[in-house]
A protein has these predicted regions:
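A ligand-binding cleft/hinge motif common to bilobed small-molecule-binding domains
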Residues: 91-100, 161, 166-170, 197-231
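Hinge/capping helix and adjacent helix->loop/strand transition within the periplasmic-binding protein
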Residues: 76-82, 97-185, 234, 245-280
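N-terminal (or domain-start) structured segment
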Residues: 14-109, 147-148, 156, 172-197, ...
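Structured segments of extracytoplasmic/periplasmic soluble domains
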Residues: 32, 48, 52, 77, ...
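An extracytoplasmic/periplasmic, membrane-proximal ligand-sensing/linker region
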Residues: 23-25, 170-173, 210, 236, ...
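Stable alpha-helical elements in mature extracytoplasmic
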Residues: 37, 41, 45, 49, ...
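N-terminal export signals
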Residues: 1-15
Length: 319
């Protein structure tokens, strides 16, 4: 009997690899530089998990190539729960279209998808000199000036670029792309009137809307955003189904044991419902999602296909 019990003991222990997880500090890899919005959000998540799970969750910044360098490194790490990654649209759902065969990982196959935490809405803003107050007025105005108006983006292949091309397709206008190296120079030229419109992050655009330096035509998600609650959605304003946003979620290397996945998913679900956290997310112009592992995996598959179609339909070139 003792031999029988001893023979079964290892199997019982092996069946519960996440029973006491975590037993040491956990790294949360962030593919953004320190101080940016992605880094701020990552630290908010890490601090919450540290408080809730009894071990330190430490943010490690590894910026470069829209996060794909960091994502590739994480994909090759042990699936033991001690390395997590803050995934986003740029390194997951638009990465294959933008990087093609150069992408060194498969966003669907090479990761365990734990929780889709938030959507990052954009707001369509215009310089005050544009003679249009509403979205429909702007569309009518732009149709009288095909290829004569310009829109700024954060860079070629960025979500602000994709949103504007989706807008061109949905509205039938032809506004010309001017790519910048990041948000700051793009916003600076918009404020100076060198370009007419852009899809900016809600956090950035809200202060210029409230100061009257820019005007809003609407937000890019199907839900209104509390930080700019006076701005309608583009869907409400006459572009049915318009829904373009980046997103942020937590993933790990493929093969993460189910108990660890479940433990993290439960705590991250609590994160998206915590009243203090929700106030901070509202202040950052974010929309809570909270989809768990199965729904997150489905989202990545479907959103990748949707973005691939948009990129093809708009003939967007990344090189």
């Amino acid at each position: 009997m003792r031999l029988l019990a001893a023979a079964f003991a290892p199997q019982v222990l092996a069946a519960e690899p996440g029973q006491n997880y975590p037993t040491k500090s956990v790294r949360l890899i962030v593919g953004y530089p320190p101080g940016g919005a992605g880094d701020i959000f990552g630290r908010l998540v890490a601090n919450y998990l540290s408080q809730q799970m009894g071990q330190q969750f430490i943010v490690e910044n590894r910026p470069g190539a829209a996060g794909t360098i960091a994502a590739a490194q994480v994909a090759r790490m042990p699936a033991d729960g001690y390395t997590l990654y803050l995934a986003s649209a740029g390194d997951f759902t638009t990465a294959r279209s933008s990087f093609g065969a150069r992408l060194p990982y498969n966003p669907e196959r090479d990761f365990t998808h734990i929780t889709l935490l938030v959507k990052v809405p954009l707001v369509l803003v215009a310089h005050p000199s544009v003679p249009a107050t509403t979205l429909q007025e702007f569309i009518a105005y732009a149709k009288t000036k095909p290829k004569q108006l310009n829109y700024a983006s954060f860079g070629n292949g960025s979500t602000s670029h994709l949103a504007a091309e989706a807008f061109n397709l949905a509205s039938g206008v032809e506004v010309t792309h001017v790519a910048y190296k990041g948000s700051s120079p793009a916003v600076a030229d918009l404020l100076a009137g060198r370009v007419q419109i852009m899809f900016d992050t809600v956090l950035s655009g809200s202060r210029f809307i409230k100061s009257g330096q820019l005007k809003s035509y609407g937000v890019s998600t199907l839900k209104r955003v509390p930080l700019v609650s006076e701005s309608p959605t583009l869907d409400e304003s006459g572009l049915p189904g318009f829904d373009i946003a980046t997103w942020l979620g937590i993933v790990a290397p493929a093969g993460l044991p189910a108990p660890i996945t479940q433990a993290l998913s439960l705590k991250l679900d609590d994160f998206t419902k915590d009243p203090d956290i929700l106030k901070q997310l509202d202040a950052l112009g974010l929309l809570v999602d909270g989809s768990g592992p199965a729904a997150f995996s489905t989202f990545i598959f479907e959103e990748s296909a949707r973005m691939d179609k948009l990129i093809k339909d708009a003939a967007i070139q990344f090189d």
